[in-house]
Amino acid sequence: VEVVWGDTDRCPYSVGESGSRTTIQTGLAVVQAVEELRSQIADQGMPNGGDVLIGTATPVPTTDGKTRQCFCAHYVEVEVDTRIGTTRILKYTAVHESGRIINPTTARDQIRGATIQGIGQALHEDLLYDSDSGQPLTPGYYRARHLTHQDVPDIDVTFIEVDDGYGPFGAKTAGESGIILAPAAVANAVANATGNRMTSLPIT
């Protein structure tokens, strides 16, 4: 089986794989193309010849009109130094219902990476501009103070699998869901620890 991908001479135009849609779009396209090939083979009575069969499928997933979402819950324990205003993450647990998980290892790493981005938004990262020139004062990764794995504890990720997904084998969107909850979870933990509700990010 030869898969044609990443060739702009042979593949249709695509806006790229982003927005947590790689598994859904690519996975469904592969499944549908293979199903078409299987149908062609069945129509020819399972021949043993050297003919080449070509199966195609749309990269746009089709649904029955039902909106399906992934659901998540994050728990975070923080330590706040009220003297100098710093916050340290002590424990982080993320529970995600993302349909059927096709590759648990990469799915967990996606959730961890997205969660670290969300923690960075909550505690460190800021986009500052010079009020006179309008030029950014935090260009690049270094000045923006992006978090690294050394800055956060191990993030415990648990998946609750259901067969309600519209993707291949019941998969759902998962990649970016961790970044949505993390800032709110951290802000709520800081508010619970200090009694002060934060209304802007980063929390300082």
Question: At which residue positions do the language-model features occur?
Answer:
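Cofactor-binding beta-sheet edge motifs in enzyme active sites
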Residues: 2-204
